[in-house]
């Protein structure tokens, strides 16, 4: 029973590049939630749009890392719309962008561990 309630706490998400849905899911899976971005989409003047619909009572942190796990961007929110020109500068020379949602307990005094959900990996051109 604990396992199923833990899965429900994940919520659902969408990762959109230039109004094109790249990844949509509700189960964190680093092997399945992977998409290669076309060079034309990556070089355009559009947006990276990340939308997370939460389940449960947590504090949420959206995090972008490179392929080696180095944090490139982080914000306390469940959704973000970022200019691709800004993201291209952050990820210049990188091969992948990994997108995570960090779920922290709503009360710091709870001493519960944070959960990290892999929302998706974008393979960059």
Question: Where on the chain are the PLM-derived regions?
Answer:
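Bacterial N-terminal signal peptides
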Residues: 1-4
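Terminal leader/tail segments of proteins
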Residues: 7-125
